[in-house]
């Protein structure tokens, strides 16, 4: 590896410390199945399932992004009886805010009744990689001891920017929110890899509807997912045997299968719930993380890897300790 390439790799990596003290998620009650989509566009349940792995997706049906975010956040708070007054940082990753200003994070703050002095609340938009970017930002802010407790949320209402006449995109997306509460903990190391290519063409939501070049996105995503996992494992000296689960952004089962093959890591090491929710963008990783932690408890010496990719073209991964 030449010196410049090595320096570029180092710049995309960082390590820090935090503990995830609780998680929560929410998906709306309304379900749009593949059978429903058969009545709306020229497609079939078998075609969608075979090519994407998606069987159904949840639709907000009038609920806003902050509505979903607050329910996910409240579930994370209630799960362990967390004192919400300890929260002094709120970051929401989304590309579907219900209004331009105020941001979703400010609305979450208001709905949770958190009005103490010094609290910081803001949104970020890194598309489907947004949750990993938000975790990275939260870690940096917790590390300087100014903030003690961060509420990080990925929340999307993609149905409002989905063209249900476009069979190439309407089959893919769903609505939902996932939340985590973080506290600084010097015993819990976290490794991050984040990147952006500065692409403005492959995935767009310029006006009312999302559009994408599916084949080129697939090519980028398959490589980016495997590359980010490799970078995190290498930088953190993480062995395959120490990985409890890999939680990928849930965009397409074929992308996950491709990464599994490229890494020579069995598919059952990847947590997959795309069949239930479709692509929920920034919400997909925290939703999957919450579901995974409901099903199993990683040991203290095991790692959970999160990996995402999205418009921009952004990508990122992180290795968590529990």
Regions from the language model: what does each represent?
Residues 9-62, 164-223, 227-230, 309, ...:
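Condensing-enzyme catalytic core mediating Claisen C-C bond formation in acyl metabolism
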Residues 20-22, 48, 76, 90, ...:
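Buried hydrophobic positions in well-ordered alpha/beta secondary-structure cores of metabolic enzymes
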Residues 41-47, 100-114, 151-158, 255-266:
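Acidic-glycine-rich active-site phosphate/pyrophosphate-binding loop
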Residues 66, 70-73, 96-97, 110, ...:
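Claisen-condensing/thiolase-fold acyl-transfer catalytic domains that form or cleave C-C bonds
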Residues 72-88, 228-242, 292-297:
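Phosphate/pyrophosphate-binding loops at sites that engage ATP/ADP/AMP, CoA/4′-phosphopantetheine
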Residues 79, 83-114:
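Anion-binding (especially nucleotide phosphate/pyrophosphate-binding) glycine-rich loop
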Residues 93, 125, 150-156, 182-183, ...:
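Short beta-strand segments
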Residues 143-174:
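Flexible, glycine-rich active-site loops centered on histidine and acidic residues
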